[in-house]
Swiss-Prot record:
A GO CC annotation given for this chain: cytoplasm
Taxon lineage: Bacteria, Pseudomonadati, Pseudomonadota, Gammaproteobacteria, Alteromonadales
Catalyzed reactions per annotation: GTP + H2O = 7,8-dihydroneopterin 3'-triphosphate + formate + H(+)
Complex formation: Toroid-shaped homodecamer, composed of two pentamers of five dimers.
Pfam families: GTP_cyclohydroI
InterPro entries: GTP-CH-I_C/QueF, GTP-CH-I_N, GTP_CycHdrlase_I, GTP_CycHdrlase_I_CS, GTP_CycHdrlase_I_dom
UniProt GO BP: one-carbon metabolic process; tetrahydrobiopterin biosynthetic process; tetrahydrofolate biosynthetic process
Record keywords, A-Z: GTP-binding, Hydrolase, Metal-binding, Nucleotide-binding, One-carbon metabolism, Zinc
Protein name from the UniProt record: GTP cyclohydrolase 1
GO molecular function ontology, one term from the record: GTP binding
Record pathway: Cofactor biosynthesis; 7,8-dihydroneopterin triphosphate biosynthesis; 7,8-dihydroneopterin triphosphate from GTP: step 1/1
Binding site for Zn(2+): 108, 111, 179
Sequence similarity: Belongs to the GTP cyclohydrolase I family.
PANTHER family tied to this protein: GTP CYCLOHYDROLASE 1, GTP CYCLOHYDROLASE I
């Protein structure tokens, strides 16, 4: 299936800036990927001495394969990029548009465990205005990959800048990393904050302060 114009533009913008997730070209269909993941997951679980003949575990390899391809890693396939509604700013609206407390669930690419957090997005309309739900969908698309939070924040920024045809976009993310919470140092209270600021949000101290203050 050919990619949408929005998906092509966003992918090219990320590649140009060196912000694309490290990926190899896929030579398999989604169903072929599921079959191969299921096969290898059976081997992994067997190596862990789990009895896959037990009815509780028998379908686990297939469940994981479907979850990886259709859900938590679906953002690796630009065919799943959300349908984007961007309209001309005919009303001349020029005040800050802000969407906050966007829920996001991603996966740490170092240990493949959960990143759980929220995002706040703002932009100053110029030529284009985007449907509000599309902002949430763009966050979700890029979260549905193995990620590091710093890259995820930048990817959402560049995607919105590309689609809105303006640099005046700001992104802030706050998240708990289960690679910190459930293993290693096992710190259950810390969280990580990242920001990506463009245009006037980066160059104008008052606009930056307004965004960051309201994001608390």
């Amino acid at each position: 299936m050919p990619l949408s114009e929005a998906a092509v533009k966003v992918q090219a913008a990320l590649q140009e800036r060196g912000l694309e997730t490290p990926m190899l070209p896929s030579v398999f269909t989604p169903e072929e990927r599921k079959d191969k993941i299921e096969h290898h997951m059976k081997e992994i679980l067997t190596l862990m001495s789990l009895d896959l003949s037990d009815d509780s575990l028998a379908d686990t390899p297939r469940r994981i394969a479907k979850m990886y391809v259709d859900e938590i890693f679906s953002g690796l396939d630009y065919a799943n990029f959300p349908k984007i509604t961007v309209i001309d700013n005919k009303m001349g609206f020029d005040e800050m548009v802000r969407v906050q407390d966007i829920s996001l669930t991603s996966t740490c690419e170092h240990h493949l465990v959960t990143i759980d957090g929220t995002a706040t997005i703002a932009y100053l309309p110029r030529k284009k205005i985007i449907g509000l739900s599309k902002i949430n969908r763009i966050v979700r698309f890029f979260a549905q990959r193995p990620q590091v939070q710093e890259r995820l924040t930048q990817q959402v920024l560049v995607a919105l800048q590309t689609l809105l045809e303006t640099k005046d976009v700001a992104v802030k993310m706050d998240a708990v990393h289960y690679c910190v919470k459930s293993r290693g140092v096992m710190d259950s209270t810390s969280s990580t904050t990242t920001t990506a600021l463009g245009g006037i949000f980066k160059s104008n101290p008052a606009t930056r302060a307004e965004f960051l203050h309201q994001s608390k």
